């Protein structure tokens, strides 16, 4: 596999941003009651998977998927907190810490 370079990292970062956008739009669509927001959410998911498919051309699939999912979860938690006033329980915080530690271990491996 090629080296973890800026080009493929850019696609991975784009995939993360699009995934977060999709999650936010899905929440705002109110279960597709606001159809246009729901459709934008689906478009963002399609974009996220397209970007991820480009990222894995230069990043091992296991690493790319773990980082994509991990950063997506962490940032979606932050977005939920900031935009929708959602809070994590202490168990949720423990899970987030474990997730971040796992991502760090994968990145350093």
From Swiss-Prot:
The chain crosses the membrane at residues 6-26, 36-56, 64-84, 88-108. Keywords: Cell inner membrane, Cell membrane, Membrane, Transmembrane, Transmembrane helix, Transport. Pfam families: Multi_Drug_Res. Signal peptide: none annotated. GO terms for biological process: glycine betaine transport. This is Spermidine export protein MdtI. InterPro entries: Small_drug/metabolite_transptr (IPR000390), Small_multidrug_res (IPR045324), Spermidine_export_MdtI (IPR023737). Catalyzes the excretion of spermidine. It comes from the Bacteria. Belongs to the drug/metabolite transporter (DMT) superfamily. Small multidrug resistance (SMR) (TC 2.A.7.1) family. MdtI subfamily. The gene is mdtI. Forms a complex with MdtJ. Its main location: membrane. One of its GO terms (cellular component) is plasma membrane. The keyword Cell membrane applies. Gene3D superfamilies: 1.10.3730.20.
């Amino acid at each position: 596999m090629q080296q973890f370079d800026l080009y493929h990292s850019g696609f991975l970062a784009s995939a993360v941003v699009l995934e977060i956008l999709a999650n936010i739009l899905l929440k705002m669509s109110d279960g597709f009651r606001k159809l246009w927001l729901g459709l934008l959410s689906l478009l963002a998911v399609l974009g996220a998977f397209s970007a991820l498919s480009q990222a894995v051309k230069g990043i091992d699939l296991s690493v790319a998927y773990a980082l994509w999912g991990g950063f997506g979860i962490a940032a979606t938690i932050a977005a939920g907190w900031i935009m929708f006033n959602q809070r994590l329980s202490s168990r949720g915080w423990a899970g987030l810490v474990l997730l971040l530690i796992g991502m760090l271990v994968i990145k350093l491996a």
